[in-house]
Swiss-Prot record:
GO terms for molecular function: bis(5'-nucleosyl)-tetraphosphatase (asymmetrical) activity; GTP binding; nickel cation binding; phosphatase activity. Keywords: GTP-binding, Hydrolase, Nickel, Nucleotide-binding. It catalyses: P(1),P(4)-bis(5'-guanosyl) tetraphosphate + H2O = GMP + GTP + 2 H(+). This is Bis(5'-nucleosyl)-tetraphosphatase PrpE [asymmetrical]. One of its GO terms (cellular component) is cytoplasm. SUPFAM superfamilies: Metallo-dependent phosphatases. Belongs to the PrpE family.
Length: 250
């Protein structure tokens, strides 16, 4: 099985398309396909903050529907799903950019994109365990003792990470560095916490290299075990990145 796992896109369509071309995907029959039958895996948070969330939804929906990609929801995806269901959610932390795009559409197009995203979300797994290659893709990661579970505790961890319930001075949730204590045999590939370079620790790989915050969009290729990145077109915001050499908690 040959896969390309792509980090948090956050509405950065141009960077995503550039990365797909760099990975060797070409547009065929109206969508991206690879001559070597590779498949794409999205680690979640495909929307919010970036300029083209609606177009990214359409692209990911099409790829998944045609069985050319897998999609794993992230915390931003969960919030957008609840918004589309009619629940009251706070339109901030990036959601406001997606809802603004959504409201600019005609009612017909709004209905279309809403139903596409709901279908995409509801048909996707909480996390993806590819047992034949011993790889697990989970948005914010998953510790060894939760692998195989899908209860509320597991869902919270997979979407938000190992949260403490506390916040730092900037309002960001403080998270424990779960990867430092992971000792499982399966490789865990995840995103959620922006880092300047992919972080490899104890069979865990963080590939959220903060494209929407001006750094780069990264893919991890398997079985090659190599990283492929493209530069971001967004403004660089240094304070959005975690330096684990300075602190093991976020």
């Amino acid at each position: 099985m040959k896969i390309d796992i792509i980090g948090d896109v956050h509405g950065c369509l141009e960077e995503l398309e550039e990365l797909l071309f760099k990975l060797g995907y070409q547009i065929k029959n109206g969508t991206y396909q690879h001559s070597n039958n590779r498949q794409i895996v999205f680690v979640g948070d495909i929307t919010d903050r970036g300029p083209d969330s609606i177009k990214v939804i359409k692209l990911v929906y099409q790829l998944v529907k045609e069985k050319l990609a897998y999609y794993i929801p992230g915390n931003h995806c969960n919030k957008l799903y609840r918004f589309f269901q009619g629940n009251k959610v706070m339109e901030k932390h990036g959601l406001e950019t997606t809802t603004a795009e959504y409201r600019s559409l005609s009612k017909e197009k709004q209905n279309n994109i809403k139903h596409k995203f709901i279908e995409l979300y509801e048909r996707s797994p909480l996390y993806l365990h590819l047992k034949n290659i011993n790889v697990i893709i989970a948005h914010a990661g998953i510790p060894e003792h939760l692998i195989g579970k899908k209860d509320k505790r597991t869902k919270t961890f997979v979407l938000y990470g190992d949260i403490t319930g506390e916040f730092d001075t900037t309002g960001k949730p403080i998270r424990r560095d779960w990867a430092k204590h992971y000792h499982g045999d399966s490789w865990i590939v995840y995103g959620h916490t922006p880092v300047l370079e992919p972080r490899v620790v104890n069979h865990t790989i963080n590939i959220d290299t903060g494209c929407v915050f001006g750094n780069k969009l990264t893919a991890y290729r398997f079985p090659e075990k190599e990283f492929v990145s493209v530069a971001s077109r967004q403004p660089f915001i240094a304070e959005k990145f975690t330096d684990f050499n300075v602190s093991n908690e976020h």
